[in-house]
Amino acid sequence: MLGARTGGARIEVSRCIAASLKCQTACEAGMARLKAQGVAADDDAVRLLRQCAELCELNVRALQKESRLSRRTASLCFELGSQVARAAWLEAQDPDSHALARDALHLARACRPLVFAA
């Protein structure tokens, strides 16, 4: 057993994978909403969502492969998920933004046990 599974239970890995997939979908939907509103692709909000979606995808692959780097990707998801949740909540103007904030916070909480596992 490598990476996150060394110190984390299988259920924690499964939760982190599920939360990563859900957050990836939410971030991609958020990017589409911003694009539809005319926000430029190089805008900070769009870049943050793109980074989060890409990192979520990488995290899922690392955890599924039991990669040595999976603890690092989970750590980055914890960190970036917290940033996305905060940004989405502070700038929330609609239910979709609140849902994005919820999904990103769920990602951070789901990945946290893998980051701080012994």
Say what each PLM segment does:
Residues 1-118:
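Amphipathic alpha-helical hairpins
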